[in-house]
Regions:
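Accessory beta-strand-rich segments of carbohydrate-active enzymes
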Residues: 28-34, 64, 104-251, 278-279, ...
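N-terminal carbohydrate-binding accessory modules
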Residues: 363-432
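Low-complexity, Pro/Ser/Thr- and charge-rich linker/hinge segments at domain boundaries
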Residues: 200-220, 247-253, 381-399, 821-840, ...
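Substrate-binding/catalytic cleft of secreted carbohydrate-active enzymes
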Residues: 439-637, 670, 674, 681, ...
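Carbohydrate-binding surfaces of carbohydrate-active enzymes
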Residues: 22, 273-280, 367, 620-887, ...
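Extended acidic/polar, glycine-enriched regions
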Residues: 169-176, 272-389
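Extended carbohydrate-recognition surfaces in non-catalytic/accessory domains of CAZymes
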Residues: 20-133, 155, 215-238, 246-248, ...
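Bacterial Sec-dependent N-terminal signal peptides
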Residues: 1-21
Length: 919
């Protein structure tokens, strides 16, 4: 009976601690210009704020005003030019003053904004320590609680930090409390220069250069792939919480894992945390830890069950703290042998194994009560890295649990107004994982919301975390000492690491992308990283393209980095064989961390953000349908850097489009072949030259026509599905440079007795050449099989169809390529009749998702080429996102195929979706 009572007591204590955290979501917002009362009055619970704007936090100021109908959504059309900027100079230049919503004419973004909310604190908070945490603000803040100033803008500064404030003396448990936060603009909002991108193939919009001085998001001032955000994203952009503890608190827990045996049969787990006495008297207590295996992994729309059993690991340690003392407490296998876990369930990257997670709960006990508690998931895994050398070039190689990982993925951006939901975050991570990506980076997300890293953990997406973004500081220029406040920068790095370091998905800490900080910041950052985490490599920069001896000799101790985006390929269209030739050159290609090309969305997306898309008024223009709106949304170019070559290829290969839909459809052919080639070029020399490849970019921060494989609406375009095919662990491909059929096995299991079939099919459907052979392919390698002859006897357009099957005849991989035998001519694709496929489908509701099974058959005597499949809702509108096993299906006469799709019940409006072939 005593044991049962103890268990019940611990359960009650656990629930009490968890129940003490409150998220404050519903707020009121008002410009300080319109608030004449004092701060103490505004933050009093009795204050009347009914006339203020109702907002849901997290939100920036501008996004709140868009939601409330004060300004149009800047992400669509040219709406951004109907919103005044924080820069008066820019407003005058672009005549934006007339759009100011303020009747007094004052700039709406230069002064502070109040965010105010009221919350009834539980009575159980009485006698406890009460903490208010701001998880992300931009840029400075004063915080008031119940008429009292808790902290001011001199200490609450920086976008990439959390702020935990002790509000015990001002909180009123059992009563209504007011929290009021005054948010201030960034210190250096800058002037957008030029800030516009309205000419097709014209100059890029540039930046707001002064913004680089602050610890804030640089793309808020404009970028080649991002519009100028008029308020520079000032606001409370991450959640605000209140929690209660007793006098002994836990902070900065850190779980590290190593695999001391090469066969990974044993894991050594180490747990550490800081324990702090917040009182003015000595405290004696205990620290407890409980580690369990996570068998049911939760996602927003489904739950994934993971097999396995681990007996819960329970650890206890006595701790004694003097008044105000802070102490490091550790649990190690030397003292607690159960932390040596036999036959551990390991976390692997996507495509290399399961993503097993473990859960740890840490508690501080004082007397019979829980003083503080923290819990989170972690993964048992070990990341190591080394360099592969060819001549003077180096490629970085990552190993997870002793197995080398061929890195395939790309870069992402946040929504330009920082608007996100947990579901959208997980949807994006799922799109990446289902595309067979395993590595993701961002130069624009130094402090992502926790859900991003949690989703990467669950989907097996390795993440290298970039501290200082991109091109904020460039050696040898006037920006080299940015950011202005180095102490703030390093403090921000410290909080990033403390916040994220328990995530198994993080494989490297990266100083910045493409550039490098000055020596003082470089050394301070490196020292901070080494003091907080030695389990991961620190890479000071992803790339460098300057005279190191002259400008950054201090960098030499961290060279070579083994990754780069210097030189070509860059970010424009090129023929597929170009990427293969570049890889064969070796130089700057061994771990290519950025390359890309434009990738126009499907027409159904384009028409949503380009209002002129449905017009044919300018059909005779040589650049139809492109106009200033297309330019603003990505159709720019300088020195053939971006969009011009892509557009030229569309018109040269497929003819002049008669509608915007024609243009988007032609673009799908081009993007599919180009993005596939970027990944297959890396595949064709896997490990003997290449160890990784990352595209710029995976997603878009706003509706855009340039670099992406799925668009802002979460609609994948053709480049997504052809990249997905190229990144599959077991893959068959045709090398674009020498027409060799190659089997790529990036898995760690050998392929035994597989069958390769290759055919050349003319456009009249006759088979001009074919080959079949059986072979075995070792683990983690590639094998050339046969060369497709190029003898000039094929029709003007022809196809190469590849299949790889296992011993039982099951399809492992397939691929389809289209070629011209003369000139760059695919006009046939734009004029040929597409036979309708015979289709059937079944829909099954599975918890919170629908699974749709589609069967397709081509009963005609002609090719049915590039069929884009979609699901529609009750109104006939296309549903997104939908997670297709394959898409853009081509079937030759007599062929059939089964494809599966999954979609959230909520995204379908709760109504059974319908299958369509989109036209």
């Amino acid at each position: 009976m005593k044991n049962i009572s103890l268990i019940l007591l611990l359960c009650v204590q656990s629930l009490w601690v968890q129940a003490q955290t409150l998220e404050l979501k519903q707020w009121r917002m008002m410009s300080s210009l319109d608030v004449k009362d004092t701060e103490a009055q505004v933050s009093a619970p009795s204050y009347e704020a009914g006339q203020w704007q109702a907002v849901t936090v997290p939100t920036t100021v501008l996004n709140a005003m868009v939601k409330n109908g004060i300004y149009p959504d800047p992400r669509f059309g040219l709406n951004n030019y109907q919103i005044p900027d924080v820069s008066d100079e820019f407003n005058k230049r672009m005549d934006l003053v007339k759009y100011n919503h303020r009747k007094d004419g004052r700039n709406p973004w230069q002064d502070s904004y109040w965010y105010r909310t009221e919350v009834k604190l539980p009575k159980t908070y009485k006698g406890k320590k009460v903490w208010l945490t701001l998880h992300g603000i931009n840029y400075r803040a004063d915080v008031w609680v119940n008429g009292h100033l808790v902290a001011n803008k001199d200490t609450l500064v920086g976008m990439f930090r959390r702020f935990k404030l002790d509000i015990t003396n001002y909180a009123k448990p059992g009563a209504t409390n007011c929290v009021a936060v005054k948010i201030y603009q960034v210190d250096h909002p800058g002037v957008p220069t030029p800030g516009t991108q309205l000419k097709v193939f014209g100059p890029v919009r540039g930046h707001s250069y002064d913004l680089f001085k602050d610890e804030t998001l640089k793309i808020s001032g404009g970028w080649d792939c991002a519009p100028v955000v008029r308020d520079r994203n000032m606001g409370i952009y991450q959640k605000v919480t209140i929690e209660a503890t007793d006098k002994m608190i836990l902070e900065h827990p850190f779980v590290t894992t190593t695999l001391p045996k090469k066969d990974t049969s044993v894991a050594d787990v180490k747990v550490q945390m800081e324990v702090c006495n917040t009182s003015n008297q000595k405290l004696n207590g205990k620290v407890q830890a409980m580690i369990t295996l996570v068998n049911d992994v939760k996602f927003p729309t489904y739950t994934k069950h993971m097999d396995g059993f681990l007996k819960p690991i329970k650890l206890t340690k006595q701790v004694s703290l003097e008044a105000g003392e802070r102490k490091m407490v550790e649990f190690t296998s030397a003292d607690f042998p159960t932390l040596l876990i036999k036959k551990p369930y390991l976390w692997y990257p996507n495509g290399y194994g399961e993503q097993y997670l473990h859960h740890i709960k840490l508690s501080c006990l004082l007397g019979n009560g829980v003083s503080d508690s923290k819990e989170f998931d972690f993964g048992i895994r070990e990341v190591t890295t080394d360099l592969h050398q060819i001549g003077d070039d180096y490629g970085r190689v990552f190993y997870v649990n002793g197995k080398r990982v061929f890195c395939k993925g790309g870069w992402i951006q946040p929504d330009i107004l920082l608007e996100e939901t947990e579901k959208r975050i997980y949807d994006e991570a799922r799109l990446m994982a289902e595309a067979n990506m395993n590595i993701i980076g961002s130069e624009d997300m130094p402090s992502p919301s926790d859900e991003w890293l949690e989703s990467f953990d669950k989907y097996g997406l390795m993440w290298w975390h970039v501290f200082y973004q991109c091109f904020r500081m460039t050696p040898g220029t006037e920006t080299e000492h940015n950011p202005a406040n180095h102490d703030l920068a390093v403090t921000s790095v410290e909080d990033m690491m403390l916040r994220y370091r328990n995530h198994p998905s993080i494989i490297a800490w990266v100083g910045c992308n493409e550039v490098l900080m000055d020596e003082s910041l470089y050394r301070a950052t490196k020292a901070k990283v080494k003091s907080l985490d030695t389990s991961r490599i620190y890479i000071p920069t992803t790339s460098y393209n300057w005279d190191v001896d002259e400008l950054t000799p201090y960098l030499k101790e961290d060279l070579p980095t083994g990754t780069t985006d210097d030189g070509a390929p860059d970010y424009n269209w090129a023929p597929s064989d170009y990427f293969f030739h570049k890889v064969d050159e070796v130089h700057l290609q061994m771990f290519r961390n950025e390359l890309g090309m434009p990738s126009v969305p499907v027409y159904n997306s384009v028409r949503k953000f380009i209002p002129t898309a449905e017009s044919t008024a300018n059909v005779n223009s040589p650049i139809f349908p492109l106009d200033s709106i297309w330019a603003e949304h990505g159709a720019w170019d300088v020195s053939n850097y971006c969009y011009r070559s892509y557009d030229n290829a569309i018109r040269t290969m497929f003819g002049d489009p008669k509608t915007a839909k024609d243009y988007c459809d032609f673009g799908q052919f081009l993007s599919a072949d180009g993005y596939r080639a970027m990944f297959e070029a890396a595949n064709h020399r896997m490990w003997d030259i290449t160890s990784g490849v990352m595209i710029w970019k995976v997603n878009s921060c706003w509706p855009d026509v340039c670099w992406q494989v799925y668009d802002w609406f979460l609609t994948p375009n053709a480049s997504y599905y052809f990249s997905k095919k190229a990144m599959e662990p077991v893959h068959i491909q045709l090398n674009a440079d020498d027409f060799k059929v190659t089997v790529v096995n990036a898995s760690h299991q050998a392929l035994e007795g597989v069958t390769v079939t290759a055919k050349v099919i003319n456009n009249d459907m006759s088979v001009a050449w074919e080959h079949t052979s059986q072979l075995s392919v070792g683990a983690d390698c590639y094998k050339p099989v046969v060369t497709v002859p190029q003898n000039g006897t094929y029709t003007y357009n022809y196809f190469v169809k590849l299949e790889l099957r296992d011993k039982s005849g099951n399809l492992l991989s397939d691929n389809l390529y289209w070629y011209y035998s003369q000139h760059m001519d695919f006009f046939w694709f734009s004029t040929m009749e597409k036979p309708a496929l015979t289709t059937s489908y079944e829909v099954v509701k599975d918890d919170r998702e629908y699974e749709v099974t589609v069967r397709l058959k081509n009963e005609s005597k002609r090719l049915s080429f590039f069929n884009r499949m979609a699901l529609t809702d009750a109104q006939g509108e296309e549903i997104n996102p939908v997670f297709w096993s394959d898409n853009y299906i081509s079937l030759f006469p007599g062929e059939e195929k089964e494809v599966k799709a999954r979609v959230a019940v909520s995204d379908a409006g709760g109504v059974t979706p319908k299958f369509v072939i989109a036209h």
